[in-house]
UniProtKB/Swiss-Prot annotation:
Allows the formation of correctly charged Asn-tRNA(Asn) or Gln-tRNA(Gln) through the transamidation of misacylated Asp-tRNA(Asn) or Glu-tRNA(Gln) in organisms which lack either or both of asparaginyl-tRNA or glutaminyl-tRNA synthetases. The reaction takes place in the presence of glutamine and ATP through an activated phospho-Asp-tRNA(Asn) or phospho-Glu-tRNA(Gln). The lineage of its organism: Bacteria, Pseudomonadati, Pseudomonadota, Alphaproteobacteria, Hyphomicrobiales. Its EC number is 6.3.5.-. It comes from Methylorubrum populi (strain ATCC BAA-705 / NCIMB 13946 / BJ001) (Methylobacterium populi). Heterotrimer of A, B and C subunits. The gene is gatC. This is Aspartyl/glutamyl-tRNA(Asn/Gln) amidotransferase subunit C.
Length: 95
């Protein structure tokens, strides 16, 4: 797959990037080099290779999914000028 000037301009338009006319050619070359590299990656034989999610084997620490207030409500509202029952009090905006 190769990228032409029209495709470079379309990508720039979709990304909302202003590209000067003199920059279209170099960008075309860079995008074609990236696509060539991706095509090389597709040719790599990965038969029998287990997918990795991390470079070191580790298990995720899991906890029970429980709804709670975190036990820190008083710490959260401690710096608020006014509070009531662990809620922030703010001035009325609409009468």
């Amino acid at each position: 797959m190769s990228v032409d000037e029209t495709t470079v301009r379309r990508i720039a338009h979709l990304a909302r990037i202003a590209v000067a006319d003199e920059d279209v050619g170099p960008l075309q070359g860079e995008l074609n080099a990236i696509l060539a590299f991706v095509e090389q990656l597709g040719a790599v034989d990965v038969e029998g290779v287990e997918p990795m999610t991390s470079v070191t084997p580790m298990r995720m620490k899991k906890r029970a999914d429980v709804v709670n207030d975190g036990g820190r409500a008083s710490d959260i509202v401690a710096n608020a000028p006014e509070t009531e029952d662990n809620y922030f009090l703010v001035p009325k905006v609409v009468e």
